From Swiss-Prot:
Region (Cytidylyltransferase): 345-476
Record-linked CDD domains: RfaE_like
Signal sequence interval, chain numbering: none
Full protein name: Bifunctional protein HldE
Catalysed reactions, as listed in the record: D-glycero-beta-D-manno-heptose 7-phosphate + ATP = D-glycero-beta-D-manno-heptose 1,7-bisphosphate + ADP + H(+); D-glycero-beta-D-manno-heptose 1-phosphate + ATP + H(+) = ADP-D-glycero-beta-D-manno-heptose + diphosphate
Function description: Catalyzes the ADP transfer from ATP to D-glycero-beta-D-manno-heptose 1-phosphate, yielding ADP-D-glycero-beta-D-manno-heptose.
Record-listed E.C. numbers: 2.7.1.167, 2.7.7.70
Gene Ontology CC annotations of this record: cytosol
Complex formation: Homodimer.
Pathway: Nucleotide-sugar biosynthesis; ADP-L-glycero-beta-D-manno-heptose biosynthesis; ADP-L-glycero-beta-D-manno-heptose from D-glycero-beta-D-manno-heptose 7-phosphate: step 1/4; Nucleotide-sugar biosynthesis; ADP-L-glycero-beta-D-manno-heptose biosynthesis; ADP-L-glycero-beta-D-manno-heptose from D-glycero-beta-D-manno-heptose 7-phosphate: step 3/4
InterPro entries for this protein: Bifunc_HldE, Carboh/pur_kinase_PfkB_CS, Cyt_trans-like, PfkB_dom, RfaE_dom_I, RfaE_dom_II, Ribokinase-like, Rossmann-like_a/b/a_fold
Length: 476
């Protein structure tokens, strides 16, 4: 499926649900407390991020959509911090304030990119407070195209059926990020987005694709829901509707670093895309790409439009693979690193591509997720190899290399050595063929200094460009 991003700035979205504050206390730890067998963390940084439904709204705003956020908060410092955080990014708050209840806060203590403990500050809200919030939210229905119900089972959304009916009657799509085993509460919704665990909590265990589709179709019929998007971790997503074949979308995530807020990212990308005019399959593909980006980040995070553009160009081959310029490659590498991919780089003239080259490049690619081949341009080959070389011009050499399954990117360089371009791109692993010493490999010191590594691979015995040329000349 070719995926195109809509004009997100045209999207008008209302998010209703359980808002919370994600608070991070971060610092180094180097000793154990004398009071108990626990680490001592010396806090050096405190950061507040909008979480729950607030993170959904923040994701919509980061993509460029117009968004309002309705939620329940206490009259406390956490509510003030949450308000400041969302307003700074263009989200309009519509709070229902409750006396004597705290704003839901999740405090995480972090050290060395690891979460040591989480402390939750929350109390359940009475059902009357949920009714008051939904009544407050009805006033915004005339000005939006999509409503998101972000349910974390904290009491903000207890019985939303009447609200859903009013929204649908006004032509507003209602998307639900569900919680719990009672999907009857979301009767009449346009779309629900359970993960696989939430889906199986409702329908029982699922052992095959066919069973997943069958049970999803039954839910659609039972609760008058238009569509279900089941998020399935490493298996991607599956969209089931009543009037079309199921759509399986494979994951684009290469490495999962932190799943905090991933579900928020999915539904916010769906809502923004649909509100901006995308059809449902397109919106699901955009949401899948956004999820692949966010799980490679630490903590509750958002995804920007530019990140989506770069990810889609790389994942769908519109640009970013094959023969590229240095600047194009720099953008592609930035996205690859967001996905947690290990990048390998090698270089050479590759004047007459032979079996030894193919074997060597295959070995190099197997050491990581992506392989860059930097190629000497024609002038540098002539300086290094002498008159009569190269046999093949650089554009032809690059085209042949780019056609190999093992090669992701081919980039030219003009100098006699690739030191400058390696120093700019800084791969995770620099590979060189032959009998080099690691300390003599151009760019090796820079790669190691940046935290990468250098490796020497052997070539096939008796196979070289020089010997091939000599054999050709001898047989003329």
């Amino acid at each position: 499926m070719k995926v195109s991003l809509p004009a997100f700035e045209k999207a008008k979205v209302l998010v209703v649900g359980d808002v919370m504050l994600d608070r991070y206390w971060t610092g180094p730890t180097g000793r154990i407390s004398p009071e108990a067998p626990v680490p001592v963390v010396k806090i050096s940084q405190i950061e507040d991020r909008p979480g729950g439904a607030a993170n959904v709204a923040l994701n919509v705003a980061t993509l460029g959509g117009q968004v309002s956020l309705a939620g329940i908060v206490g009259k406390d410092e956490a509510a003030d911090a949450l308000t400041t955080g969302i307003q700074a990014l263009g989200v309009e708050p519509k709070w229902h304030c409750v006396e004597g209840k705290p704003t839901i806060t999740k405090l995480r203590v972090m050290s060395r990119n690891q979460q040591l403990i989480r402390l939750d500050f929350e109390e359940a809200y009475p059902e009357d407070e949920s009714k008051a919030l939904l009544t407050l939210s009805e006033s915004a229905l005339d000005n939006v195209a999509v409503v998101v119900l972000s349910d974390y089972a904290k009491g903000a959304i207890t019985q939303p059926q009447e609200f859903i009916q009013k929204a649908i009657a006004k032509g507003v799509k209602v998307l639900v990020d569900p919680k719990g085993s009672d999907f009857s509460r979301y009767r009449g919704a346009s779309l629900i987005t359970p993960n696989m665990g939430e889906f199986e909590e409702v329908v029982g265990s699922v052992s095959s694709e066919a069973e997943l589709v069958e049970k999803a179709q039954a839910l659609l019929s039972e609760f008058d829901i238009e569509a279900i998007l089941v998020t399935r971790s490493e298996k991607g997503m599956t969209l089931i509707t009543a009037d079309a074949p199921e759509l399986h979308i494979p994951t684009v995530a290469r490495e999962v670093y932190d799943v905090t807020g991933a579900g928020d990212t999915v539904i916010s990308a769906l809502a923004t895309s649909l509100a901006a005019g995308s059809d449902l399959p397109q919106a699901c593909a955009i949401a899948n790409t956004a999820a692949g980006i966010v799980v490679a980040k630490l903590g509750t995070s958002t995804v920007s439009r530019i990140e989506l553009i770069r990810a889609l160009s790389v994942n769908h081959g519109e640009s970013g693979f094959g023969a590229v310029s240095e600047d194009q490659l720099a953008y592609a590498l930035e996205q690859a690193r967001l996905r947690g991919e290990r990048v390998v780089m090698t270089n050479g003239c590759f004047d007459i591509l032979h079996a030894g080259h193919v074997s060597y490049l295959k070995q190099a690619r197997e050491l990581g997720d992506r392989l860059i081949v930097a190629v000497n341009d024609d002038d540098s080959v002539k300086r290094l190899k002498g008159e009569g070389r190269p046999v093949n011009q650089s554009d032809r050499r690059m085209a042949v290399l780019a056609g190999l399954a093992s090669v992701d990117w081919v980039v030219p360089f003009t100098e006699d050595t690739p030191q400058r371009i390696i120093s700019r791109l800084l791969p995770d692993l620099l590979v060189k063929g032959g009998d080099y010493k690691i300390e003599d490999i151009a760019g090796g010191k820079e790669v190691i200094a940046a935290g990468g590594s250098v490796k020497v691979l052997g070539f096939e015995d008796g196979v070289s460009t020089t010997s091939i040329i000599e054999n050709i000349m001898a047989n003329q």
